[in-house]
UniProtKB/Swiss-Prot annotation:
Family membership noted in the UniProt record: Belongs to the prokaryotic molybdopterin-containing oxidoreductase family. NasA/NapA/NarB subfamily.
Transmembrane annotation, as ranges: none
Maturation and modification: Predicted to be exported by the Tat system. The position of the signal peptide cleavage has been experimentally proven.
Organism of origin: Cupriavidus necator (strain ATCC 17699 / DSM 428 / KCTC 22496 / NCIMB 10442 / H16 / Stanier 337)
One GO biological process term: Mo-molybdopterin cofactor biosynthetic process
Positions of Mo-bis(molybdopterin guanine dinucleotide) binding: 85, 152, 177, 181, 214-221, 245-249, 264-266, 375, 379, 485, 511-512, 534, 561, 721-730, 805, 822
Signals that turn on the gene: Expressed independently of nitrate induction and anaerobiosis.
Name recorded for this polypeptide: Periplasmic nitrate reductase
Catalytic activity: 2 Fe(II)-[cytochrome] + nitrate + 2 H(+) = 2 Fe(III)-[cytochrome] + nitrite + H2O
UniProt: [4Fe-4S] cluster binding residues: C48, C51, C55, C83
The protein's assembly and partners: Component of the periplasmic nitrate reductase NapAB complex composed of NapA and NapB.
Enzyme Commission (EC) number: 1.9.6.1
Length: 831
């Protein structure tokens, strides 16, 4: 039998993907392996600790230690598969440098910011924290305290943190590291649909006819979902895969259409497709007339830089970047008509034929399209626009909220959706899509939390980028970091990150399991419990909430972030944090601590210890004398029930392999906004985008605008940063797994061979990557998995010995306030 080279690549793609993903045993064998009678191990379910896919795993415990993990064959998400990172979950908690005692900078037996780290007791640690926070609150008020949290917080950790800051300290200066990864997606959902998170689910992978990847390397970042794309492509020959990126990566092995485009010009291509749909009379007029409205957004909105930056000073609409006016369909058609094939092809460097092939997939009414994106769209100075504009394509054609027709924002962290977004740990949000700027939303939160009216501030707090700037400027002085490594992850860290941590006026606390770059820059380091060392809940990218029990104890004196938050609340009486006029509205709170008001309020503490499953430990329940996790969850769930964010009762999640909200009458929802699938859609409406008052989604007219920084003669290369399969985020867990470390020990500079040759460089040569902000040393790689075009270099950011974010620019999308890590100008200098 003859087989072409292309067919050979197609057929081997699934094998290669399975190889890098790490396919586990067939279900029957897997069940045998996890049979406690055979293995003499106790096996329990849990979601994976890594990305937002939400794979289910089974965890084996022996002698109070995790000794094995494998893909859960009963999990709908991954059906028994694991990626290579998931295979080594059992090792992430057992690095040799695991933190087991609090560490504080000391000199002569006392705290000193310029001292060396020394072990202290928890009482000593909290004593100093208490002193510093009370000092700052007294001197400057609640705007001078803050917290940087995480999409890796469990649901109840994020909820407890939001309560402590927004209600207890009365400060909205709490933000998650999801600001770096999912803020543009969230803002895009809210602007278009009035509600956050995808309307579809992973079932769409088995129903789509075409997959279009906009800036997403799923083969490495979401490998289990990529196996589903691969399976669909190879099982159904008419299925098409389109991969758009600024450089070639592993997804291109499966692509029917591979498109390399100039950075930022995805905006122009999106408008071209909308124009193509209209010009070729492929608009679903019935759907558009019934279910959409058109708006034109303001332009020239700046780049989220400091106010004195020339680009910010020149921007005409930086003060209100999200403003928009209603327009007609004809006005929208005229707006996108400027984006014709000649203009867009020249701007993007994409051949016209490929643009038309891509556009036809969206335009053809018989092709079900799944659009998929991650950081390529979200880490973008116009990231919110990019999200809005891809929804335009699905709304114009009516290809939305039905099986296989799905604009799908993939998530990078295990609970960026479930905790950062749904719980509302962003500086402007409250639970269930409510916001601090809305008086009715604040009133509802205060009612549920039993707070006096006016407790929650009405202005958004400092977002992630602004927190670093305010630390540097001395306006944010008491700061707590949990479950993230922002000194490695934040852009422009030498100019805007590290100075704030070392500012003598500031006291920085970092809770972590390992001595990360961020921990080493702190004043106090608190040892945290990890993953199954505590009871937890995550919410994944398809709205699936998943629970797990505590399976082992944390080592030494390590404590969960939840325990740390709630225990610290005992240190503050309301008189020390609230003004007298506020307490006068609730005089019964006089003399009580924030712990009493927030966590022993008759709601959070109403579930007794006997409700805890006797088969499992629960360190927090034991410490506080009630089922803390259940109480927090049930109080939190009150926000969403009856409002389109319905969560099932707490105990149901310990039985199920996750449930996709809204969960109404015990039934999960796979497709939102569609009649017959979503219980909130009224009979006879067909579709209802009920997040907006009129029940309609918004189609936005938005232009192409250039990036904040582009290559020039002095800095001739684009720099793109990102991740690799073997490591997750900053590598603080994966680099401590020997097998993963050996597979990709250090970051490299992926570069086109001709660019390297022109500079007199060869593979393996040491170079410096230099920008206007800083420099970083690495080695050139001209082969391998990633192949940049000429004029662009790609550098992963997992390597703590190569801090590429010394170089990046802290420009953001002015609407979402998410950083653009994908576009800045650099030069490459031989060492």
């Amino acid at each position: 039998m003859k087989i072409s080279r292309r067919d050979f690549i197609k057929q081997t793609a699934i094998t290669a993907t399975a190889s890098v993903a790490g396919v586990t045993l067939p279900a029957g064998a897997a069940n045998f392996v996890t049979d406690s009678e055979v293995t003499k191990l106790k096996w329990s379910k849990a979601p994976c600790r890594f990305c937002g896919t939400g794979c289910g795993v089974t965890v084996a415990v022996k002698d109070n230690k995790v000794v094995a993990t494998q893909g859960d064959p009963q999990a709908e998400v991954n059906k028994g598969l694991n990626c290579v990172k998931g295979y080594f979950l059992s090792k992430i908690m057992y690095g040799q440098d695991r933190l087991t005692r609090p560490l504080m900078r000391m000199k002569n037996g006392k705290y000193d910011k310029n001292g060396d780290f020394a072990p202290v007791t928890w009482d000593q640690a909290f004593d100093e924290m208490e002193r510093q926070f009370k000092r700052v609150l007294k001197e400057k008020g609640p705007t001078a305290v803050g917290m940087f949290g995480s999409g890796q917080w469990t649901v109840w950790e994020g909820y407890a943190a939001a309560k402590l800051y927004k209600a207890g300290f009365r400060s909205n200066n709490i933000d998650p590291n999801a600001r770096h990864c999912m803020a543009s997606a969230a803002a895009g959902f809210m602007r278009t649909f009035g509600m956050d998170e995808p309307m579809g689910c992973y079932d769409d992978f088995e129903a789509a006819d075409a997959f279009v990847l906009w800036g997403s390397n799923m083969a490495e970042m979401h490998p289990i979902l990529w196996t589903r794309v691969t399976d669909r492509r190879l099982s159904h020959p008419k299925t098409r895969v389109v991969v758009l990126s600024t450089f070639t990566h592993r997804c291109f092995d499966l692509a029917d259409i591979g498109i390399i485009f100039k950075p930022q010009t995805d905006l122009a291509m999106l408008n071209y497709i909308a124009n193509y749909i209209i010009r070729n009379n492929k608009v679903n007029k019935d759907f558009v007339n019934k279910h959409t409205v058109f708006k034109e957004g303001v332009t020239d909105i700046g780049y989220g830089l400091r106010p004195d930056h020339p680009l910010q000073k020149a921007a005409k609409n930086a003060s209100d970047p999200g403003a928009a006016k209603v327009i007609t369909f004809d006005e929208f058609a005229k707006f996108v008509s400027k984006y014709d094939a000649d203009y867009v092809s020249k701007l993007s460097a994409v051949p016209k034929a490929k643009l038309d092939q891509l556009a036809e997939l969206y335009a053809d009414p018989n092709i079900k399209v799944m659009s998929l994106w991650t950081m390529g769209f979200n880490q973008h100075t116009r990231g919110t626009w990019a999200n809005n504009m891809v929804y335009n394509l699905h709304l114009l054609t009516g290809k939305i909220a039905t099986p296989g027709n799905s604009p799908f924002s993939l998530t990078g962290q295990p609970s960026a959706c479930g905790t950062a977004r749904e719980v509302g740990t962003f500086s402007h949000r409250l639970p269930a899509d409510m916001v601090v700027t809305n008086p009715k939303h604040r009133e509802e939160a205060e009612r549920i939390w039993k707070l006096p009216p006016g407790t929650i501030p009405d202005k958004p707090g400092y977002d992630a980028v602004l927190q670093n700037r305010m630390l540097k400027d001395g306006k944010l002085n008491a700061y707590w970091v949990q479950v993230n490594n922002n000194m490695q992850a934040a852009a422009n860290l030498m100019e805007e990150g590290l100075p704030g941590y070392r500012n003598p006026a500031n006291f920085i606390v970092v809770s972590d399991a390992y001595p990360t770059v961020t921990a080493l820059a702190a004043d106090l380091v608190l040892p945290s419990a990890m993953w199954v060392e505590k009871e937890g809940a995550y919410g994944n990218a398809e709205r699936r909430t998943q629970f797990w029990h505590q399976l082992v104890d944390a080592p030494g004196e390590a404590r969960s972030d939840l325990w740390q938050l709630v225990e610290f609340a005992k240190r503050f009486k309301v008189e020390e944090v609230w003004p007298p006029e506020l307490i006068a509205k609730k005089p019964e709170y006089k003399g009580k601590t924030l712990y009493d008001v927030l966590y022993r309020n008759g709601q959070v503490d109403k579930f007794p210890l006997k409700d805890v499953n006797a088969e499992y430990h629960n360190a927090e329940a034991k410490a506080f004398g009630f089922y803390l996790q259940k109480g927090l969850f049930e109080e939190y769930a009150t926000f969403g029930r009856g409002h389109g964010h319905d969560l099932a009762p707490f105990d149901a999640y310990h039985e199920a392999r996750g449930l996709r909200w809204p969960v109404v009458n015990g039934k999960e929802t796979r497709w939102r906004y569609r009649e017959g699938s979503d219980p909130y859609v009224k009979a006879g409406t067909g579709f209802q985008f009920y997040g907006n008052p009129d029940g309609k989604a918004v189609i936005f007219a938005l232009p192409y605008e250039p990036p904040a920084e582009s290559p020039d003669k002095e800095y001739p290369y684009w720099l793109v940063t990102g991740r690799v399969l073997e490591h997750w985020h900053s590598g603080s867990m994966t680099r401590r797994v020997p097998e993963l470390y050996r597979s990709f020990p250090n970051a490299v500079v992926f570069m086109h061979p001709e660019d390297a040759k022109a500079l007199g460089l060869r593979r393996g040569v040491e170079v410096e990557v230099v920008s206007r902000r800083g420099r970083m040393r690495s080695r050139i790689e001209t082969r391998g998995r990633d192949a940049p075009p000429r004029g662009l270099v790609f550098v992963p950011w997992f390597d703590a010995s190569q801090l590429i974010n010394k170089v990046t620019l802290d420009a953001t999308c002015p609407i979402s306030l998410q950083t653009d890590f994908k576009k800045c100008a650099v030069k490459i200098v031989k060492v």
